[in-house]
Curated annotation (Swiss-Prot):
Family: Belongs to the cytochrome b family.
InterPro entries, per the entry: Cyt_b/b6_C, Cyt_b/b6_C_sf, Cyt_b/b6_N, Cytb/b6-like_sf, Cytochrome_b, Cytochrome_b_C_euk/bac, Cytochrome_b_N_euk/bac, Di-haem_cyt_TM
Cofactor(s) annotated in UniProt: heme b
Entry protein name: Cytochrome b
GO molecular function term, any single one: ubiquinol-cytochrome-c reductase activity
Annotated transmembrane regions: 33-53, 77-98, 113-133, 178-198, 226-246, 288-308, 320-340, 347-367
Length: 379
C-alpha cells in the first residue's frame, strides 16, 4: 500500500513541495529567507485580519479606531505593533532575499526572478496603502505626496490622480479604497508566491557555488524543514523582543497626530524601507524624471539576467564583482539615510552621487567586472 502522502491528491502536492523535494546539500542560511517571508506573510495576514475587525475606514473615525484598538481591545496594542513592525521585518527579509539572489546569481532562473519582482511591487503597494490607514499626519501627507507623483505622467496624469483619489484631494473615498486594496492584496501576494514556488521547483534551488547540484541532492524533510524552523525561532525571538521593547522605534512621531490637511509636516518621508527609492526620486530636480528614476530603481532588477556577462554564476569566486556588490549594499544604506534627511546641502549632492552610483554599478560596472573576471580566469 502506498504511503498516503504519496497517493492522496492534496498531500501529494505538499509532499512534492516540502517533504520529498530534492534540495542541494550545501545551501546556506541565506536560503532561509524564502520560508521567513512566508512566515512574515502569515503574521501580517493574521494580525491584519484582527485589526480589520476593529478598524473603521472613515476619515472621522479612522484615527480614533486605531487608538481604540490600542486602548480598549484585548491585546490590541500587541496586534497593532506586531502588524506595524511585521512590515519592517517583511522588508528586511525581502531585501536580504533579493541580495542573496543577486550575489549567488539566482536571477538566472528568469521566471522565478521576474515573479519575485512582481511580488516586490505588490508588497510595496500593500505597505504604502497600509501606512495611510491610521490617518495620522504622515499617513495623510505621505498619501498626498506619493499619489501626486502620478500627475507627472503626460496628458493623463491629473485625471489619473483624481481617479485614484476619488475626488479632488485625499479624502474619505481614498481611505476606503486603500483599505479595500490593503485587505485584498496580501491574498494576491500569497497566490503569486505559490507561482513563484512553482517556477522554482521546476528548476530546483540554486546553491552558493552556482554549479549544478543534481549529483548531490538531499530530501527537503527533515534537513531543511528543521533548518527553516531554527531560522523561524531565531527571527521570532528577535522580532518579539523588538515589538515588546522598541515598538515605536521605526515609526514616525507625526503619525500620533491626527491627519490635518491645513498643516503640512516639516519633513514628509515614507517608512524606512522606502527611503532609498525616495532618495533616488528626490535626487532628480524634474518631477517626471524623478518618477521615472523611482520606478527604474526597482525595475532595474529585471535587467540582471540580461546583464550577466560572467561565465560563473555565483559571485563566490569573483572578487571584483564581490567588491562592487558590497559597494552597492553600502550605497543603498547611504540612500536610505539621505531619504530621511531634509532637501538641503550637503544632502542633495550626496543623494545625487549615490543615485548615479546605484545605477552605474548595476548597469555598467557589474557587467564589465564579469568580462574582466572571465579574462583573468581565462574562461
Amino acid at each position: 500500500m502506498t504511503i498516503m502522502r504519496k497517493s492522496h491528491p492534496l498531500m501529494k502536492m505538499v509532499n512534492h513541495a516540502f517533504i520529498d523535494l530534492p534540495a542541494p546539500s550545501n545551501i546556506s542560511s541565506w536560503w532561509n529567507f524564502g520560508s521567513l517571508l512566508g512566515l512574515c506573510l502569515i503574521i501580517q495576514i493574521a494580525s491584519g485580519l484582527f485589526l480589520a475587525m476593529h478598524y473603521t475606514s472613515d476619515t472621522i473615525s479612522a484615527f480614533s479606531s486605531v487608538a481604540h484598538i490600542c486602548r480598549d481591545v484585548n491585546y490590541g496594542w500587541l496586534i497593532r505593533y506586531i502588524h506595524a513592525n511585521g512590515a519592517s521585518l517583511f522588508f528586511i527579509c525581502l531585501y536580504l532575499h533579493i541580495g542573496r539572489g543577486i550575489y549567488y546569481g539566482s536571477y538566472l532562473y528568469k521566471e522565478t526572478w521576474n515573479i519575485g519582482i512582481m511580488l516586490l511591487f505588490l508588497t510595496m503597494a500593500t505597505a504604502f496603502m497600509g501606512y495611510v490607514l491610521p490617518w495620522g499626519q504622515m499617513s495623510f501627507w505621505g498619501a498626498t505626496v506619493i499619489t501626486n507623483l502620478l500627475s507627472a505622467i503626460p496628458y493623463v496624469g491629473t485625471d489619473l490622480v483624481e481617479w485614484i483619489w476619488g475626488g479632488f484631494s485625499v479624502d474619505k473615498a481614498t481611505l476606503t479604497r486603500f483599505f479595500a486594496f490593503h485587505f485584498i492584496l496580501p491574498f494576491i501576494i500569497a497566490a503569486t508566491a505559490m507561482v513563484h514556488l512553482l517556477f522554482l521547483h521546476e528548476t530546483g534551488s540554486n546553491n552558493p557555488l552556482g554549479i549544478p547540484s543534481d549529483s548531490d541532492k538531499i530530501p527537503f524533510h527533515p534537513y531543511y524543514t528543521l533548518k527553516d524552523f531554527l531560522g523561524v525561532i531565531l527571527v521570532l525571538a528577535l522580532f518579539l523582543t523588538f515589538v515588546l521593547f522598541f515598538p515605536d522605534l521605526l515609526g514616525d512621531p507625526d503619525n500620533y497626530s491626527p491627519a490635518n490637511p491645513l498643516n503640512t509636516p516639516p519633513h514628509i518621508k515614507p517608512e524606512w524601507y522606502f527611503l532609498f527609492a525616495y532618495a533616488i526620486l528626490r535626487s532628480i530636480p524634474n518631477k517626471l524624471g524623478g518618477v521615472i528614476a523611482l520606478v527604474l530603481s526597482i525595475l532595474v532588477l529585471a535587467l540582471f539576467p540580461l546583464l550577466h556577462t560572467a561565465n560563473q554564476r555565483s559571485m563566490m569566486f569573483r572578487p571584483i564583482s564581490q567588491f562592487l556588490f558590497w559597494t552597492l549594499v553600502s550605497d543603498l544604506f547611504i540612500l536610505t539615510w539621505i531619504g530621511g534627511q531634509p532637501v538641503e546641502p550637503p544632502f542633495i549632492i550626496i543623494g545625487q552621487i549615490a543615485s548615479i552610483l546605484y545605477f552605474s554599478i548595476i548597469l555598467l560596472l557589474l557587467p564589465i567586472a564579469g568580462l574582466i573576471e572571465n579574462k583573468i580566469l581565462k574562461w
